[in-house]
């Protein structure tokens, strides 16, 4: 099966790929360089969470495996496609609920908080069918 990720046309996409690492400062700087200044801090936090998950959980911090980020900053939105070489991910929490008590996973859970952070920062948070590519979009 071939999984296609539809991308907007007439869009200038940038791409960065890097070996699995948790040293993300320069990569994050590049990815937020053209993001509106009032968004930069929260977008940086969200992208850091997503990139750490891709490198650590997806690629198991294997330096032979890369994380690929395609990104575009458009007039009315910014979007990032983050792809890892892992076995895939199935989201277990849906943090899109308006009930504040349901936004976070159980206090004893070791996973799920990052997902909630992503849903708070970005307007669209979607995985491809294989669970190896995450699309994050923030609308202006």
Regions found by a protein language model. Name each.
Residues 1-45:
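Bergerat-fold GHKL ATPase/HATPase_c domain
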Residues 1-13, 55-140:
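Conserved beta-strand-loop-beta-strand hairpin that lines the nucleotide-binding pocket
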Residues 22, 49, 93:
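Solvent-exposed, flexible loop/coil residues
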Residues 38-63:
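Conserved ATP-binding N-box helix of the HATPase_c
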């Amino acid at each position: 099966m071939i999984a296609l990720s539809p991308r907007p046309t007439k869009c200038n996409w940038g791409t960065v790929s890097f070996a699995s690492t948790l040293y993300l400062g320069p990569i994050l700087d590049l990815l937020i360089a053209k993001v509106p200044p009032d968004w930069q801090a929260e977008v940086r936090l969200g992208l850091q969470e997503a990139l750490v998950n891709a490198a650590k959980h997806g690629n198991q911090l294997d330096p032979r495996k890369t994380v690929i980020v395609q990104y575009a900053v458009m007039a009315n939105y910014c979007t990032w496609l983050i792809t890892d070489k892992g076995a895939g991910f199935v989201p277990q929490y849906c943090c899109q609920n308006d009930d504040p008590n349901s936004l976070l996973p159980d206090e004893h859970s070791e996973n799920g908080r990052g997902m909630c952070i992503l849903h708070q920062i970005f307007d669209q948070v979607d995985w491809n069918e294989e669970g190896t590519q995450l699309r994050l979009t923030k609308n202006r």
